[in-house]
């Protein structure tokens, strides 16, 4: 948590909920330690979808399908979501949730390693208006390199959990040794997206940190 918990609790109290299905799915995820987007991230995503009005969204990291369904519900009925997941135990749960939510026609789940599936999409000349990255943090830079091939100028790229509970502000020597690799790779990722000429990026201390990048060229 990188923001004051009392403030976050207050902001959560203002939310009106997402309907019984998603609200119950959140309860299930929290009870089973399944990582899903935070409530404050939901509001951010919804506003970005309302502003960008994408016709196609790519999600890297499905888990049990919560954010896929949320984005489908928040977008136009003509918008299609492609999502990638490699954890075998969560894939059938996500697929079942898509059916239960009535979103299985609007969401395509690709099973396997994210980088491999991104390259497959590149080979198939797929294009997306919006990309949501929420998978293995140490691979964000590699994902982004493939995402560039899957987007055009005007695309919106959102990367979640980029501040690592605030640890990114610490020296690598203050970080537990087992976390130093991801610490270094995420710092490299943030430096790159802030300095790339083809991106305008803002990094916001929302939830666990979110980077919003607008592709200029």
Name each region found by the language model.
Residues 1-130, 137-158, 162-217:
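A short alpha-helical cap/connector motif
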């Amino acid at each position: 948590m990188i923001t004051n918990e009392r403030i976050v609790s207050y902001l959560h109290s203002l939310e009106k909920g997402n309907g019984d299905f998603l609200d119950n799915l959140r309860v299930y995820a929290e009870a089973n330690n399944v990582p899903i987007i935070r409530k404050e991230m939901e509001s951010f995503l919804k506003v970005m979808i309302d502003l960008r009005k994408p016709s196609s969204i790519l999600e890297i990291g499905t888990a049990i399908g919560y954010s896929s369904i949320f984005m489908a519900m928040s977008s136009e009925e003509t918008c299609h979501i492609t999502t990638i997941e490699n954890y075998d135990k969560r894939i059938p749960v996500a697929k079942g949730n898509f059916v239960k939510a009535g979103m299985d026609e609007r969401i395509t789940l690709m099973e396997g390693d994210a980088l491999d599936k991104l390259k497959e999409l590149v080979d198939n000349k797929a294009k997306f208006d919006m990309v949501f990255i929420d998978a293995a943090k140490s691979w964000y830079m590699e994902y982004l390199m493939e995402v560039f091939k899957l987007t055009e100028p005007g695309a919106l790229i959102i990367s979640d959990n980029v501040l690592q509970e605030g640890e990114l502000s610490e020296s690598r020597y203050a970080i537990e040794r087992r976390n130093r690799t991801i610490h270094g790779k995420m710092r490299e990722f943030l430096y790159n997206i802030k300095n790339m000429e083809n991106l305008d990026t803002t990094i916001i201390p929302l939830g666990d940190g979110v980077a919003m990048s607008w592709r200029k060229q």
